[in-house]
Design a protein with these regions (language model features):
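Glycine/threonine-rich phosphate-binding loop and adjacent beta-strand/alpha-helix elements that clamp
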Residues: 44, 48-132
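C-terminal, flexible cofactor-proximal segment of oxidoreductases
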Residues: 86-87, 98-216
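A conserved short coil-to-beta-strand element within the FAD-binding core of flavoproteins
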Residues: 9, 13-35
C-alpha cells in the first residue's frame, strides 16, 4: 500500500471493520444490510466492484429512475457491458446527483500514474463537498451541455493516434463501428495527465458554476 496511515486507520474510534463472508445484500435508505442481518447506517457509500471496469453488475439509480447503465449504454442484451460512456471528466454523471466516480470512464489516459490521479480526484471531490457544505448546497450534478462537451473532447483526444486504427478495449466503439458510421464513443481521455488536470482543477473548459448544477 502507498498510504502509511492505512492500517492505523482501523484503530480510530470512528472506524469499524465489518467482516461478513457473504457481504452486503441490500442497500437501505440509511445505509447497508449485511447477509448476517446486521444493518449499518452510513453517510457515504463507496462502490468497489472489482476490476471488470466495463461491467455494471447492479443498478445505480439516480433522478427520475435514470440509471448509470442507461447513461453508459449498458443493458441486458450486451450483458451489462458499458458501450457509450457519457460524463464530465469521468467523475460526474448527469441525473446522478452527489455521485462521484474515481478513475472512471473518460478520465484517464491508459498510461497515467493511477495513484496520482486518485489523489487529485480525491482532493477535487473533498473540496467540492466542502464548498457545498459551506454554501448550504445539498445536490450537485453536471449540466447536460457540460457532459456533451467533455464527451466530444474525449472523442477528439484520440484523433491522430493509434487507438483509432484498430479494435481495442479503450475505444468503446470499434474501428468497424466508426467505419460504418455508427456513434463513436471514447472510453478514455487520450491527452496528457497535465491537460486533464487543467480541466478538472484549472477551469480549462469552464469553471464549476458553468459546468455543474447546484441545488439547495
Amino acid at each position: 500500500l502507498f498510504i502509511d496511515e492505512y492500517y492505523t486507520t482501523f484503530n480510530k474510534p470512528n472506524v469499524r471493520l465489518v467482516n461478513d463472508p457473504n457481504g452486503v445484500v441490500n442497500i437501505t435508505e440509511s445505509g447497508v444490510e449485511m447477509a448476517s442481518g446486521d444493518r449499518h447506517d452510513v453517510d457515504v457509500l463507496i462502490y468497489a466492484t472489482g476490476f471488470d471496469s466495463n461491467h455494471i453488475p447492479f443498478p445505480v439509480t439516480g433522478r427520475d429512475g435514470v440509471t448509470l447503465a442507461d447513461q453508459y449504454g449498458a443493458n441486458e442484451a450486451n450483458n451489462w457491458q458499458m458501450t457509450r460512456p457519457q460524463s464530465l471528466w469521468g467523475m460526474h454523471v448527469e441525473n446522478l446527483p452527489n455521485f462521484y466516480l474515481m478513475i472512471g470512464p473518460q478520465s484517464l489516459n491508459p498510461v497515467t500514474n493511477v495513484t496520482l490521479l486518485c489523489e487529485e480526484q480525491g482532493k477535487y471531490i473533498a473540496n467540492l463537498v466542502a464548498r457545498m457544505r459551506q454554501e448550504g448546497v445539498h445536490e450537485v450534478e453536471p449540466k447536460a451541455e457540460a457532459v456533451a462537451d467533455w464527451t466530444a473532447r474525449c472523442n477528439a483526444s484520440a484523433d491522430g493516434k493509434v487507438w483509432l486504427r484498430c479494435n481495442n478495449w479503450y475505444m468503446k466503439s470499434t474501428k468497424s463501428d466508426v467505419e460504418a458510421g455508427r456513434e463513436r464513443s471514447q472510453g478514455m481521455w487520450m491527452e496528457t495527465y497535465e491537460t486533464y488536470l487543467q480541466h478538472v482543477l484549472g477551469g480549462a473548459g469552464g469553471d464549476q458554476d458553468t459546468l455543474l448544477r447546484f441545488r439547495a
